[in-house]
């Protein structure tokens, strides 16, 4: 604990380095697809963030002005989103008031409680800035603008080799900004070393060899989180389940009918019965409270991730046709869902094979010849 307190104190009291250019490479499935460059000069940071995968990706230019404590007092963001929408975002904090403008419109609030702004279209560099602020906070949790609470949990410290020597980077779990945490690593000086997910990473230039290890660890942390959620929230019914007092849609009559009792066992609906039909031995009975029971939806074009698996279930999507993915990542995800380790929809793997070009997706399998393409077809067929 003392080590992290000293690190936080150092990061809070020391201004950013003078005239330092921090460069990162953007990697998708281990392939270099772009860059992030941060030109740090005293309390001013100029950022160039650009990557392209499958012909799409953000083009972002940021200018951040920081106060003496490292909190943003002005933030201007211009460019385009991955699908080409214009980005024109700004933030300013002055005289105890914060004002901002993003794609949802304009807003303002008192900046006495929350001082850190979370941008709508910022680069990953800003996550390192927020992580440093959270490390300097006593409980590593703080209110942020435009709203919400960000929190930070310390994970493992790992050493990575590169041209500037070994770096002992500590991984952190940053929560509160999205439905799933972000996983990022800071070096001993508190500077961003990497941001990682199971399929994507932003890594300090020269240390790209850390990509796979970082992504594997991000997948491990993500899996552990969803395993905990599964243990807390999942219900394991040993016998048939009867939901009473529910309405169902009759596709022949095009109307809602009922109330009925719907009985299922394992993964099949056994019967739709009168609401007062007798219960058989060993059933679990659930009161549907007059709701409407609808079939699970089928997502016909998905690129599912572990973070999205549970969200699909929560949204009523119980089956997904995955149109392209990292095969190793997807295979592990399917196995964890099928054995009940985590929650997720049934996944039909639709093998993705693409020729190499400037517009290639780095997801699935890239080939250059007819023979390579046929070999990949055989590879997928053997795993159907």
Predicted regions located by residue number:
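Extracellular/periplasmic ectodomains of large secreted or surface enzymes and adhesion receptors
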Residues: 205-248, 278
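Divalent-metal coordination cores built from histidine and acidic residues
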Residues: 140, 286-294, 300, 308-384
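Contiguous hydrophobic, core-forming segments of folded domains
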Residues: 57-124, 178-189, 193-205
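Short, hydrophobic/aromatic-rich segments at coil-to-beta transitions
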Residues: 19-25, 41-48, 68-76, 96-99, ...
């Amino acid at each position: 604990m003392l080590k992290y307190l000293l690190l936080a104190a150092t990061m809070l009291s020391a201004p950013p380095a003078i005239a330092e250019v921090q460069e990162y490479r953007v990697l998708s499935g281990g392939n270099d697809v772009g860059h992030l460059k941060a030109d740090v000069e005293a309390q001013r940071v100029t950022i160039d963030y650009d990557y392209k995968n499958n012909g799409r990706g953000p083009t972002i230019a940021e200018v951040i002005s920081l106060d003496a404590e490292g909190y943003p007092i002005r933030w201007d963001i211009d460019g385009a989103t991955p699908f080409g929408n214009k980005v024109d975002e700004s933030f300013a904090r002055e005289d105890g008031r914060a004002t901002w403008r993003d794609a949802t419109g304009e807003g303002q609030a008192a900046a006495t409680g929350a001082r850190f702004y979370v941008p709508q279209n910022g680069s990953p560099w800003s996550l390192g800035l927020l992580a440093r602020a959270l490390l300097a906070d006593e409980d590593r949790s703080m209110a942020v603008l435009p709203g919400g609470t960000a929190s930070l949990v310390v994970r493992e410290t790992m050493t990575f080799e590169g041209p500037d020597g070994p770096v002992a980077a500590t991984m952190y779990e940053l929560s509160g900004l999205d439905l799933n945490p972000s996983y990022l690593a800071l070096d001993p000086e508190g500077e961003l070393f990497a941001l990682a997910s199971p399929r994507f990473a932003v890594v300090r230039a020269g240390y790209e060899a850390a990509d796979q290890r970082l992504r594997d660890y991000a997948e491990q942390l993500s899996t552990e989180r969803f395993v905990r959620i599964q243990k807390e929230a999942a219900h394991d019914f040993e016998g048939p389940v009867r939901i009473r007092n529910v309405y169902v849609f009759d596709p022949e009559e095009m109307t809602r009918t009922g109330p009925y009792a719907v009985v299922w066992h394992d993964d099949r609906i056994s019967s739709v019965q009168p609401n007062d039909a007798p219960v058989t031995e060993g059933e679990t009975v659930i009161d549907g409270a007059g709701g409407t029971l609808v079939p699970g939806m089928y997502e016909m074009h998905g690129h599912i991730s572990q973070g999205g698996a549970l969200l699909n279930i929560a949204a009523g999507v119980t089956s997904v046709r995955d149109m392209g993915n990292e095969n190793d990542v997807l295979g592990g995800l399917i196995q964890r869902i099928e054995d009940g380790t985590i929650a997720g929809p049934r996944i039909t793997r639709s093998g993705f094979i693409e020729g190499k070009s400037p517009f290639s997706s780095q997801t699935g399998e890239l080939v250059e010849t007819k023979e390579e393409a046929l070999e990949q077809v055989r590879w997928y067929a053997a795993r159907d």
